[in-house]
Amino acid sequence: MRFTTEDGVSLEGELRRPESNPRGSAVICHAHPRHGGSKDHPILWAIRNELAQRGFAVLAFNFRGTMRSGGTHGGGRSETKDVSAAVGRARLEADGPTVVVGWSFGANVALREALEDDRVAALALIGLPLEHTLDIPDVPSPAELRLFRPPVLLLAGEQDEYAPEPLVRELASAFRNPEVAIVAGTDHYLWRREREAAAIVGSFAEGSLGR
């Protein structure tokens, strides 16, 4: 499937619907396209499946300039428009709350869009880069994060070199409604822990349905 951003970029997406009527919608944002990121990474497949099983209509998409999406890579800045368009498209599938999930680069973009988008009911940030971040925009300031009211999940691997646990917990303290999950025995890519991480995201997302 395809959908279009407010600045006219056509994006490639894939929609996964639950077996019954959807209870909510979810958007999944992938890692840095300059480092091989796309909607088809194993951790994102696991999350997509988990959310669909829990009743969400799930839209995974490729950022501009990635795979079959149009446009050119915007360094994480114009990509917020991609997330906004994906949220709008996903919400056509369900009347319930919309959860946005981002991994790595996608977590950075998802966070910055969510701060400006009151359609986002919950936000899951997986491996949000807090170290080695020269090629993506800065994480918003604690004062900006404090203004975000919806629940936020910060998930990282125990050995994540981009999202070390102390920095993740420090960042979490800036949010009003944070939850932290550290997955043991894995790194930024969550190898061999995909299902465990997906279950954590799924449980968090499902909690938004009752809010």
Model-derived regions, located:
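The conserved beta1-alpha1 loop
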Residues: 27-33, 127, 156, 184
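Primarily recognizes the serine-hydrolase "nucleophile elbow" in alpha/beta-hydrolase
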Residues: 83-147
